[in-house]
Design a protein with these regions (language model features):
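Catalytic cores of the polymerase beta-like nucleotidyltransferase superfamily
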Residues: 1-278
Length: 278
């Protein structure tokens, strides 16, 4: 009876199983079934579970991303209904879940946190990116959709994934349109580096992570001329410790853009890296 009471208070059915020598597997909430179906479902009443600890809403998205599962309808509706409560959760706890989500095999699941209203509370700048179009031949979708693709295109490293999350964070603020109606985002890397610093501080990241991410955001669009002298100057200006991470950032950014001149852009990064390594 005590075990059942304990399991009832767990967050999701897949986490509400126990095993002992006498009875074997105790699975009162069909956790095995949900594992087989690939479903994240709350134990009992979802509104109650999320009211007990609002961080569980972000944990649901994180588990879905890590396991490649979907979030069951009632559980997802409860998140949408209670999303505002995540503001009661400490920044440190949100940071831990966000990093696990971003470094998972399916970081694009961040879109579920957007759709359910979670990012509106702890990362409102992301919502603005999702709602900012890019009328430009280099792009085929909103700043936010491009960002999600870029996160997925970079290796699952904390600094790299945070950099891709924030690399275009200032595009909405820097957006201008020329006479032909083409959008431009002049100065967005430098402004973005400042915005990224504010966001990462707000989420209580350590100074080393903040510095590394902000430098990569600051220089992600810097394209030196392909001569030995110019590349050496760039490495000196940007800082040798930003390499070779900067090349991973550049490639992910290109792969998340439209196909316009993609081969040419990738060839440039290859040549830049070759010169850096020489």
């Amino acid at each position: 009876a005590n075990l059942l009471e304990d399991l009832k208070r767990r967050d999701f059915t897949i986490n509400a199983m126990a095993y002992n020598e006498v009875t074997g597997l105790v699975d009162a909430f069909d956790g095995i079934g949900d594992l087989e179906r690939g479903v994240i479902r709350c134990v009992g009443n979802a509104m109650e579970r999320f009211s007990e600890d609002a961080l569980r809403m972000l944990r649901a998205v994180r588990f879905a991303a890590q396991l490649g599962f979907s979030i069951e309808q009632e559980t997802q509706e409860a998140i949408a209904g209670l999303a505002g409560n995540i503001k009661k959760v400490s920044a440190e706890r949100i940071q831990v879940e966000l990093v696990k989500l971003l470094t998972s095999p399916n970081p694009g699941e961040l879109k579920v946190a957007y759709r359910t209203g979670l990012t509106a509370v702890f990362l409102p700048e992301f919502d603005v990116m999702m709602e900012t179009p890019q009328n430009n031949p280099h792009h085929c979708c909103s700043v936010g959709e491009h960002t999600l693709k870029a996160i997925e295109a970079v290796p699952a490293d904390k600094v790299l994934r945070l950099t891709m999350l924030l690399h275009d964070i200032a595009k909405p603020a820097c957006r201008t349109a020329d006479k032909k109606g083409v959008d431009h985002f002049y100065g967005h890397p430098v402004r973005g580096s400042e915005m990224a610093r504010g966001i990462l501080r707000r989420l209580k990241f350590d100074n080393d992570t903040i510095d590394r991410v902000c430098r990569l955001v600051h220089w992600h669009d810097d394209n030196p001329e392909l001569s030995g002298k110019a590349v050496r100057r760039a490495v000196h200006r940007i800082g040798v410790e930003q390499y070779p991470a900067l090349f991973a950032v550049k490639r992910a950014d290109i792969l998340a853009q439209s196909g316009y001149r993609r081969a040419e852009k990738l060839a440039y990064v290859d040549a830049y890296e070759q010169m850096y390594r020489e």
